[in-house]
């Protein structure tokens, strides 16, 4: 087992759990007011659930134990712009963390983790772009 890799993947798993909770909250808070964006929150929540499952599966494959502690929720809001800003920030943090883990995976030549992280990173970048576009639209 590579304890450093397991710790890094557990940090990412923790953050995915936070993202799921954040997107669920945003979905529930804005769905009656902003029906045009609510499906994006729901879709991204599903993507983050998939990421969490992939991370947990990889941690088990590395003979580690997935974390179940969740701390650090964003302040809950009913304001769409604030919600989108929180989501842009969360995606930026995810991109930064996944890039760091990818660098380490490449350093230790962990091909399975590299493939998983490259796919997740592509989705996270897409999420960030989408949230940035929605934020720009909401501020017009």
Predicted regions and their residues:
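Iron-associated oxidoreductase/ferritin-like identity signal
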Residues: 1-140
């Amino acid at each position: 087992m590579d304890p450093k890799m397991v710790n890094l993947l557990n940090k990412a798993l923790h953050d995915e759990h936070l993202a799921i909770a954040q997107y669920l909250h945003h979905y529930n808070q804005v769905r009656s007011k902003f029906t045009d964006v609510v499906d994006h929150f729901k879709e991204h929540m599903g993507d983050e659930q998939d990421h969490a499952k992939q991370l947990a599966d990889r941690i088990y494959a590395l003979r580690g134990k997935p974390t179940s502690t969740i701390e650090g929720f964003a302040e809950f809001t009913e304001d769409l712009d604030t919600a989108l800003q929180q989501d842009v920030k969360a995606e930026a943090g995810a991109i930064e963390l996944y890039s760091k883990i990818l660098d380490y995976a490449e350093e230790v030549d962990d091909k399975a983790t590299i493939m998983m992280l490259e796919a997740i990173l592509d989705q996270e970048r897409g999420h960030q772009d989408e949230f940035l576009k929605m934020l720009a639209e909401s501020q017009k």
